[in-house]
């Protein structure tokens, strides 16, 4: 583990990996035309000058291109990953070293991330990314979040400072929340107004994923949201591309790297038929699997049926399937009692953001069950009768734990959305009172345009009379906000 020097604060696995990381970042830049175009367009204007951005998002090669784009537009950045298994250590090392530094003299961005963090280490990293030495509030003035953990820590800190105390960690309903409470009890003792002071200058947060957006809307509904937010997840160029096409690529990549089993001919159950579920189902069917969908929503269930999938309940198919993939963003989707009914060497994995879709705690409590590591993030669980299950990434994101996540081109869409959302919130605070917003349609369309040349796409141009006929401008936007792509 490589930690800070006097010149820079960071904590990564191994700085000597930086040259490898830099090579992969250079390759990724070619595949990320959206971010590179934004760098070129805004480099002179420096719209993020004065921004102190705390990022909590998977520390991958693609994220490295995002970080260096934010810096190129004038921002200062501190970063942590949003998942204990998703960091690519060579990417983290390259960011800590920076494009002009060396492993011996790092000169990059403060980053706190390594693959295989404990939960205690994970929340320490998040705290470090939120802690800005020698600044007026000791914190950021912008947050770029994925899953909402950085935003959650700030809000819980403010809540407990206002109450004068944080709950005892022993009362927590999960191991992870116990670590959060331990951290906040410590900060209450060290600096009783740390989070309140830190939150006072935050102009807003841009949120990457469905789960984090859900948290934001909940906080807004109950009146506890402290600063405005842009819901990047529901930008069309994010949800219809990253969620679908990204998962279509990375799910089978993760399964293949983890298990090397032939997917063709097997039966796979995909839980949920939203954008993520659609991409996962398509990828498994493309490999020749027979795919079964479970759904609570009649509209999504009808879509799945019309797309040719069997739609059933888990109870009906749990003993038949070979592969189970949760994609819902909900909790308790596969319980221990369900896993006890699965066939020998069934593969169980999750591609939703958090680790509570699969009941890992319940599985561990089964009398006589034995857990064994096959390789990092691949474990067998042997039942007393000899039956074995293969569980990927301990129920966390298998596409990032067992593989490298979504490919660069699709992440260029999402991260271009994030960059433009950061510029929007930071430069126009008067336009965004505290609420949850979606990315303006003209910016959504801009992100799509930035990726067309790379694919050889030529757009047809509306004639003025055609534009007038359908009630739009020649240059767009072309669809109303309520349009469903």
Curated annotation (Swiss-Prot):
One of its GO terms (cellular component) is cytosol. One of its GO terms (biological process) is S-adenosylmethionine cycle. GO terms for molecular function: adenosylhomocysteinase activity. It catalyses: S-adenosyl-L-homocysteine + H2O = L-homocysteine + adenosine. Its cofactor is NAD(+). Pathway: Amino-acid biosynthesis; L-homocysteine biosynthesis; L-homocysteine from S-adenosyl-L-homocysteine: step 1/1. Binds 1 NAD(+) per subunit. InterPro entries: Adenosylhomocyst_ase-like_sf (IPR042172), Adenosylhomocysteinase-like (IPR000043), Ado_hCys_hydrolase_NAD-bd (IPR015878), NAD(P)-bd_dom_sf (IPR036291), S-Ado-L-homoCys_hydrolase_CS (IPR020082). Gene3D superfamilies: Adenosylhomocysteinase-like, NAD(P)-binding Rossmann-like Domain. SMART domains: AdoHcyase, AdoHcyase_NAD. It is found in: Cytoplasm. Its EC number is 3.13.2.1. CDD domains: SAHH (cd00401). The keyword Transmembrane does not apply. Substrate binds at residues 60, 146, 208, 238, 242. NAD(+) binds at residues 209-211, 243, 272-277, 295, 330, 351-353, 399. Keywords: Cytoplasm, Hydrolase, NAD, One-carbon metabolism. Belongs to the adenosylhomocysteinase family. May play a key role in the regulation of the intracellular concentration of adenosylhomocysteine. This is Adenosylhomocysteinase. The gene is ahcY.
């Amino acid at each position: 583990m490589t930690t800070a020097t006097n010149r820079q604060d960071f904590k990564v696995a191994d700085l000597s990996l930086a040259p490898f990381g830099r090579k992969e970042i250079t390759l990724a830049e070619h595949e990320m035309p959206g971010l590179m175009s934004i760098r070129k367009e805004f480099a002179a204007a420096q719209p993020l000058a004065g921004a102190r951005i705390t990022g909590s998002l998977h520390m991958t090669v693609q994220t490295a291109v995002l970080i260096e784009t934010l810096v190129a537009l004038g921002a200062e950045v501190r970063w942590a990953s949003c998942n204990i298994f998703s960091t690519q250590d060579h990417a983290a090392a390259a960011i800590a070293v920076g494009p002009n530094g060396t492993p011996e003299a790092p000169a990059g961005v403060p980053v706190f991330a390594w693959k295989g963090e404990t939960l205690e280490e994970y929340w320490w990293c998040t705290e470090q990314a939120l802690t800005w030495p020698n600044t007026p509030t000791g914190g950021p003035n912008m947050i770029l979040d994925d899953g909402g953990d950085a935003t959650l820590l700030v809000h819980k800190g403010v809540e407990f400072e206002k109450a004068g105390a944080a709950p005892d960690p022993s009362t927590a309903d999960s191991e992870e929340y116990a670590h959060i409470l331990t951290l906040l009890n410590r900060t209450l003792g060290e600096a009783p107004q740390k989070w309140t002071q830190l939150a006072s200058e935050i102009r807003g947060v841009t949120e990457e994923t469905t789960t984090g957006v859900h948290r934001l809307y909940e906080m807004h509904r109950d009146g506890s949201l402290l600063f405005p937010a842009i819901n990047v997840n529901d930008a069309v160029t994010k949800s219809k591309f990253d969620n679908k096409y990204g998962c279509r690529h990375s799910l089978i990549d993760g399964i293949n790297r983890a298990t090397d089993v032939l997917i063709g001919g097997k039966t796979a159950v995909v839980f949920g038929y939203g954008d993520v579920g659609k991409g996962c189902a398509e990828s498994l069917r493309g490999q020749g699997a027979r795919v079964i969908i479970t759904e609570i929503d009649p509209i999504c269930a009808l879509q799945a049926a019309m797309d040719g999938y069997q739609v059933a309940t888990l109870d009906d198919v749990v003993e038949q399937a070979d592969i189970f993939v949760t994609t819902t963003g909900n909790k308790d989707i596969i319980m221990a009692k369900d896993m006890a009914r699965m066939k020998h060497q069934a593969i169980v994995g999750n591609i939703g953001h958090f680790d509570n879709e699969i009941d890992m705690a319940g599985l561990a409590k089964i009398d006589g069950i034995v857990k064994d590591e096959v390789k990092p993030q691949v474990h067998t669980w042997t039942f007393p009768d000899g039956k074995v299950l293969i569980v990927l990434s301990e129920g966390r994101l298998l596409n990032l734990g067992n593989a490298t996540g979504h490919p660069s081109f699709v992440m260029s869409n999402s991260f271009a959305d994030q960059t433009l959302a950061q510029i929007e919130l930071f430069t126009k605070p008067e336009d965004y009172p505290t609420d949850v917003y979606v990315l303006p349609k003209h910016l959504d369309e801009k992100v799509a345009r930035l990726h067309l040349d790379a694919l050889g796409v030529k757009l047809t141009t509306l004639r003025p009379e055609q534009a007038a006929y359908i009630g739009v401008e020649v240059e767009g936007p072309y669809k109303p906000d309520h349009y469903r792509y």
